Amino acid sequence: MTDKLIIFDTTLRDGEQSPGASMTKEEKIRIAKHLERMKVDVIEAGFAASSNGDFDAIHTIAGLVKDSTICSLARANDKDIQRAADALKPANSARIHTFIATSPLHMEKKLRMTPDQVFEQARLAVRFARKFTDNVEFSPEDGSRSDLDFLCRVLEAVIAEGATTINIADTVGYGVPELYGNLVKTLRERIPNSDKAIFSVHCHNDLGMAVANSLAGVKIGGARQIECTINGLGERAGNTSLEEIVMAVKTRKDYFGLDVGIDTTQIVPTSKLVSQITGFVVQPNKAVVGANAFAHASGIHQDGVLKARDTYEIMRAEDVGWTANKIVLGKLSGRNAFKQRLQELGVSLDSEAELNAAFMRFKDLADRKAEIFDEDIIAIVSEESALAQEQEHFKFVSLSQRSETGEQPQAKVVFAVEGKEVTGEARGNGPVDATFNAIEGEVGSGSELLLYSVNAITTGTQAQGEVTVRLSKSGRIVNGVGTDPDIVAASAKAYISALNKLHSKDDKLNPQRA
């Protein structure tokens, strides 16, 4: 048995199924590049048959990412599998992940198929997938609630047809660690050809046990692949959290006895990127990536950490990519110093044009904000990368506002529509409401505001505000992000960013689970 644990990231597929987390192709590419930089073994880039947009995203990522295996989900039918194979053609290393439900409830109520029909469809699906690649994964959907004898029969057959990874899906988060771990163990013991495949675990967090179940599947069951997402992103209560799995296995190598190839210094930057793109703010007390994950408020704890860090810290903040909240640059800093700091932070831009634009944003911020922190730089670069990839139909220019006690605030917003400046003026119940009314009065998008949130990038009254706006129109949901020391200006930028995404022609459809 190998001592390497394979990390399979499904942020771009299962994570995107979280309501409101739908991503554009460009956003998926940005995340995929970060996952590759993190040295994730397998990236499930989407569900090729679900939409033209997902197919295009998988195809593009397959051509750009060279150091990770690129995977597409496919239902157990020839049409889906062919679509996945076509999307994966540019990949250096490709995997087709096919699935069908095996629990009595799903077979009867959802599929309306007999067990024998499911057995045959699973077997033939893997056989067909093997025509395109020798890297085929099979998942029995709702595996944790399936009949054990039937599950053994199906898995033995698909391994015989050439499945190289068997993924035991706890689709509804029903499992508990000991039972789930023993399920994986029993399957490996009872299936005669189980040694011909790597067993994998895929757990949901409905009962708050996704990470515990996954680790039990590894320790008790002998699985050697874990399927997970950044920040535990996923539908309902989410999926297994990649950062928690990786750091648990690395920190407790004495217990698990496994190696992971992940560059852990990329965990926090990738977490922040996913949070920004999806609009899902990471809770402060979230393990590993939460803002308070390495904070010590107790006097006893603080005293201990000052004397010896390992008294209360079982891992180092810098090992997962946290940087010290220190002043790094100022308004007199030049382009080379800015570029050097980006390299030290592990941040890359795709072109000199993006670097120049980010530097100009930095200089503008430095004129308005006395102290520039690492977090400010990361926010600038992240927003600049997003702007470079957006179809910029609308562009923020300027904002002025007036507010007096007892009167409704008034906002005046200047923005460009396909290069031509327009001015919107409106009142509202607050300065942000007035600003949105001013923009909407000129655009008339007819969209619905689903979410408005503000996050301080650093501490202090001069901190930049990062605003997330989520809009919905005709069943389509998009997120826009804007940053600025002026919260109202950041709000205007975020609203315009969301409008640009609504205006784009991207064909996106949230995949239906596996």
UniProtKB/Swiss-Prot annotation:
Belongs to the alpha-IPM synthase/homocitrate synthase family. LeuA type 1 subfamily. Pfam families: HCS_D2, HMGL-like, LeuA_dimer. InterPro entries: 2-IPM_HCS-like, 2-isopropylmalate_synth_dimer, AIPM/Hcit_synth_CS, Aldolase_TIM, LeuA/HCS_post-cat, LeuA_allosteric_dom_sf, LeuA_bact_synth, PYR_CT. CDD domains: DRE_TIM_IPMS (cd07940). It comes from the Bacteria. This is 2-isopropylmalate synthase. One of its GO terms (molecular function) is acetyl-CoA C-acetyltransferase activity. Its cofactor is Mn(2+). It is an enzyme of class 2 (transferase). Homodimer. The gene is leuA. It comes from Burkholderia cenocepacia (strain HI2424). It is found in: Cytoplasm.
